[in-house]
Regions:
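Aromatic-rich, lipid-facing transmembrane alpha helices and their immediate juxtamembrane interface loops
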Residues: 9-148
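Polybasic, lysine-rich low-complexity intrinsically disordered segments
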Residues: 3-5
């Protein structure tokens, strides 16, 4: 493969990853607004007001990493992939949440709930992250990217 062809492939791959990043970022924002709106309803607020933070866009954009992970995991059962994704989401949530806490800009605080760790992750969200990871896998598979 010539250097020029390698460069063009790398550039094309970067553009595709950027599209995945934006797709996942916008989708994550929408999911969070929907989730917080439902939570608002269940706590008696019938306006069903949902919310998110601008800081969350790049965090959700990282779900684009599921595409390369899926390429390695596609031979595994859905349960294994879901567990892998939920562990990955917990890991990213912990790292980014801890970083945001140090800067005093963390948009979430789980310190008031029982199954939390350091206020940045909720262990009772494991089933939610399992399903969310599989949802992002499905979403990214609906938008195939090929590098040739």
């Amino acid at each position: 493969v010539s250097k020029k062809r390698s460069f063009l492939l790398m550039r094309r791959s970067f553009k595709m990853q950027k599209k995945d990043f934006f797709l996942c970022g916008f989708t994550g924002w929408c999911l969070e607004i929907f989730w917080t709106g439902l939570h608002s309803l269940f706590t008696g607020n019938f306006t069903m007001m949902g919310k998110t933070s601008l800081l969350m866009f790049p965090v959700y954009g990282l779900a684009a990493l599921i595409r390369p992970a899926y390429r390695k995991l596609k031979g595994f059962p859905v349960m294994v992939r879901g567990i892998f994704y939920s562990c990955g989401i917990f890991f990213v949530e912990f790292l980014i949440g801890s970083f945001f806490q140090k800067l005093h800009i963390c948009p979430w605080d789980y310190s008031h709930v029982p199954l939390q760790y350091k206020g940045v992750i909720r262990l009772d969200y494991a089933p939610l992250w399992f399903l969310t990871g599989l949802f992002f896998e499905w979403l990214l598979r609906q938008n195939p990217r090929k590098v040739s």
